């Protein structure tokens, strides 16, 4: 499972870990990512989404159905 949000398409990014001596080493910034089950009322079924915290806020703000339609329109999510 790749760590990419299915709603917002957020993914990890790379950068530098900077020490006090200004010595830089490469590191990875991970997304606040988890998998969560949602009950989709329109389809009358449970779905499991891999989402970030920002994706969860989007679902809370505009609703599950609108968020899924928006993500599938952008090509982030494929619905059967």
From Swiss-Prot:
Keyword Ribonucleoprotein included in the entry's annotation: yes
GO MF term list: structural constituent of ribosome
Gene3D superfamilies: Ribosomal protein L28/L24
Keywords annotated in UniProt: Ribonucleoprotein, Ribosomal protein
Coiled coil: none
The UniProt record lists the keyword Transmembrane helix: no
Highest taxon of the lineage: Bacteria
Region spans: Disordered: 1-21
GO CC terms of this entry: ribonucleoprotein complex; ribosome
Pfam families cross-referenced by the UniProt entry: Ribosomal_L28 (PF00830)
Biological processes annotated in GO: translation
Family: Belongs to the bacterial ribosomal protein bL28 family.
Entry-linked NCBIfam families: L28
Protein name per UniProt: Large ribosomal subunit protein bL28
The organism of origin for this protein: Azobacteroides pseudotrichonymphae genomovar. CFP2
